[in-house]
């Protein structure tokens, strides 16, 4: 049977304690005595601890601990962020004490720049403005702070300028150590040089990229030199140079030396650095070595003015490039270029090739004012071409004006003394040639006598035919023609400007060509010669030497040449010693002695020259003379 609703059944079942809890003995409006109140309070105190609230207290304590931990972590993160910003933009206070905090690595900066991803264009604006503001404030206060990490927006100039403050509170050895640790030592040295001497090092020198290029004049800057060694340098270096200009300044790095030096001979940068390092005990990283700008008036004026001050030590005579640009008399000597002087120089020195003229005449700029004006001109190529053409014209006219005797005298005057005629005679005898008969024919050969104008050297290979003929052609400054060019109309053109010609190694086809087209040429009679880009010219063929392995006298098909040639057999192998050198020396010195020895036998004395007691030919002069008389 179901239980009835309500609580009428008091004390029944398990609900009795609810009844006790719910019974209200007092009603609204009843008077409560003080005794009951105290009893009630005592009753309430008896109920303390009836309910377990420890779980609620533990949960609240855990929540408060987590909030405190989060607050501590946020505070620490904010502190670190603020500290990083201060180090980034304001610098570290350690910079005022030590400079070790300011080591700006260029490689690190480059990596930062390379890895920096560009944003929309406004991401780095705050950083740049903050950096500029900090720098302005720093410079405005007249004090720079070192240390701290450098941002990627710092330029190379700012880093160099900040590095210069390393001088404050540091000893010279520490300065040198910091210098060697720098990422760009050369830039740091150049900045220090400008700070001390007031002029950039690059304005005084011209750059040589190669360390092996030689030069006489050099500018050397040495940093961190000991004072005793700096004074000793002035004495030790005198034995190696003709001139030096030394300036010594003292700074926190030690002694800094600026030296302009002219060595007795040309030296390269490697040699100079090695020599100076051994004297002043300074590594190559602490040196700047370059040649000076010898054509700069500003550089010449700088050394000229500093030479008059008391900070410079001078030894030797001042270089001409300084005198020329600073002294009045040298300035007056500057002149305009004259082609005639250049042609006269080329003629006197037998320089007829255009490349040789340009190269050797440019080297005279230090001693010749006309050569200096030539280098300053913008028409050097035209001047070189015109000079070569005129020099060749003069040489050709001089050669054609001389006879054989005068020409031999002329070429002998250009050969050194000390030769011996015996090796030539011994070589002819070694080949079985009768020397007396050879001289008789050689006399007619040099005169260009008809039917005696061609000398043929015949023999097997390696008998010295070409060596003998080439040495004679070289002494005579003759011309060589080659049958390989026979298909050209101009292959005989070299004979037009020669006193002696040569055709080396004539083959059977060459002899057929000579027999068909060149009979008059071998006779020594006048022939018509075709020249390239020029009109035909009529000349008398000079004496010709032909070397061959074929004896033309044994060939019946060449019978018309037999009376026009003289064959000299060379049948024995050319002698060579154990060192590979020829036993018989055939050179210009020996040929000169040979002609001087056989001068009378070759009948080179002419009656028309007896009245001339001086040179066979007057001295050529193409430079206009100057009248020194005053009217």
Curated annotation (Swiss-Prot):
Compositionally biased spans, kind Acidic residues: 32-43
A Pfam family matched in the record: PPV_E1_N
Keywords: ATP-binding, DNA replication, DNA-binding, Early protein, Helicase, Host nucleus, Hydrolase, Isomerase, Isopeptide bond, Nucleotide-binding, Phosphoprotein, Ubl conjugation
Superkingdom of the organism of origin: Viruses
Cross-link (Glycyl lysine isopeptide (Lys-Gly) (interchain with G-Cter in SUMO)): 540
Enzymatic reactions: Couples ATP hydrolysis with the unwinding of duplex DNA by translocating in the 3'-5' direction; ATP + H2O = ADP + phosphate + H(+)
Enzyme class: isomerase
GO MF terms, alphabetically ordered: ATP binding; ATP hydrolysis activity; DNA binding; DNA helicase activity
Predominant cellular place of this UniProt entry's protein: host cell
Location of the SF3 helicase domain: 433-583
One cellular-component annotation, GO: host cell nucleus
Modified residues (Phosphoserine): 92
Region annotation (DNA-binding region) ranges: 168-334
GO biological process: DNA replication
Cellular compartment(s): Host nucleus
InterPro entries: Helicase_SF3_DNA-vir, P-loop_NTPase, PPV_DNA_helicase_E1_C, PPV_DNA_helicase_E1_N, PPV_E1_DBD, PPV_E1_DBD_sf, Rep_E1_papillomaV, Znf_lg_T-Ag_D1_dom_sf
Residues that, per the record, bind ATP: 459-466
PTM remark: Phosphorylated.
Function: ATP-dependent DNA 3'-5' helicase required for initiation of viral DNA replication. It forms a complex with the viral E2 protein. The E1-E2 complex binds to the replication origin which contains binding sites for both proteins. During the initial step, a dimer of E1 interacts with a dimer of protein E2 leading to a complex that binds the viral origin of replication with high specificity. Then, a second dimer of E1 displaces the E2 dimer in an ATP-dependent manner to form the E1 tetramer.
Stated family: Belongs to the papillomaviridae E1 protein family.
HAMAP family recorded: PPV_E1
Protein's UniProt name: Replication protein E1
UniProt organism field: Human papillomavirus 30
Gene: E1
């Amino acid at each position: 049977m179901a239980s009835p609703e309500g609580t009428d059944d008091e004390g029944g079942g398990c609900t009795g304690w609810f009844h006790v809890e719910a019974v209200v003995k007092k009603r609204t409006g009843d008077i409560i005595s003080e005794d009951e109140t105290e009893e009630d309070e005592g009753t309430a105190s008896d109920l303390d601890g009836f309910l377990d609230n420890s779980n609620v207290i533990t949960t609240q304590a855990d929540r408060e601990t987590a909030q405190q931990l989060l607050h501590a972590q946020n505070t620490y993160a904010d502190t670190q962020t603020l500290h990083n910003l201060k180090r980034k933009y304001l610098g570290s206070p350690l910079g005022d004490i030590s400079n070790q905090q300011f080591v700006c690595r260029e490689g690190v900066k480059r990596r930062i720049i390379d890895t920096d991803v560009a944003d929309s264009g406004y991401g780095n604006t705050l950083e740049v403005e903050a950096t500029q503001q900090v720098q302005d404030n720093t410079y405005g206060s007249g004090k720079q702070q070192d240390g701290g990490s450098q941002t990627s927006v710092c330029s190379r100039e700012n880093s160099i300028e900040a590095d210069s403050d390393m001088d404050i509170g540091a000893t010279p050895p520490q300065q040198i150590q910091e210098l060697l640790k720098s990422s760009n030592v050369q830039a740091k040295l150049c900045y220090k040089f400008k700070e001390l001497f007031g002029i950039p090092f690059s304005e005084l020198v011209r750059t040589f990229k190669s360390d092996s290029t030689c030069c006489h004049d050099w500018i050397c800057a040495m940093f961190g030199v000991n004072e005793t060694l700096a004074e000793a340098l002035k004495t030790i270096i005198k034995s190696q140079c003709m001139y030096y200009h030394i300036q010594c300044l003292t700074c926190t790095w030690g002694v800094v030396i600026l030296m302009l030096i002219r060595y007795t001979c040309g030296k390269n940068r490697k040699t100079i650095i090695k020599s100076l390092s051994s004297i002043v005990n300074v590594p190559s990283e602490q040196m700047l070595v370059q040649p000076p700008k010898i054509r700069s008036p500003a550089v010449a004026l700088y050394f000229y003015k500093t030479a008059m001050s008391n900070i410079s030590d001078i030894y030797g005579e001042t270089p001409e490039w300084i005198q020329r640009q600073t002294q009045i008399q040298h300035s007056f000597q500057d002149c305009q270029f004259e082609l005639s002087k250049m042609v006269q120089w080329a003629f006197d020195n037998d320089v007829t090739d255009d490349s040789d003229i340009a190269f050797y005449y440019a080297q005279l700029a230090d001693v010749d004012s006309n050569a200096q004006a030539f280098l300053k001109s913008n028409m050097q190529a035209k001047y070189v071409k015109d000079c070569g053409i005129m020099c060749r014209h003069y040489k050709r006219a001089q050669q054609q004006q001389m006879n054989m005797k005068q020409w031999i005298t002329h070429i002998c005057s250009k050969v050194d003394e000390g030769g011996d005629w015996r090796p030539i005679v011994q070589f002819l005898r070694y080949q079985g040639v009768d020397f007396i008969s050879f001289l008789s024919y050689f006399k007619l050969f040099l005169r260009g006598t008809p039917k005696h104008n061609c000398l043929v050297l015949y023999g097997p290979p390696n008998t010295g035919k070409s060596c003998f003929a080439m040495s004679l052609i070289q002494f005579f400054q003759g011309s060589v023609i080659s049958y390989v060019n026979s298909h050209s109309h101009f292959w005989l053109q070299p004979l037009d400007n020669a006193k002696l010609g040569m055709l080396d190694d004539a083959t059977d086809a060459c002899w057929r060509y000579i027999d068909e087209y060149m009979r008059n040429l071998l006779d020594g009679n006048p022939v018509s010669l075709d020249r390239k880009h020029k009109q035909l010219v009529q000349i008398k063929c000079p004496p010709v030497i032909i070397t061959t392995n074929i004896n033309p006298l044994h060939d019946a098909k060449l019978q018309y040449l037999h009376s026009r040639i003289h064959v000299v057999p060379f049948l024995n192998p050319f002698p060579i010693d154990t060192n590979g050198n020829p036993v018989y020396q055939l050179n210009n010195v020996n040929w000169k002695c040979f002609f001087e020895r056989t001068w009378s036998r070759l009948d080179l004395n002419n009656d028309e020259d007896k009245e001339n007691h001086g040179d066979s030919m007057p001295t050529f002069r193409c430079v206009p003379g100057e009248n020194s008389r005053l009217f």
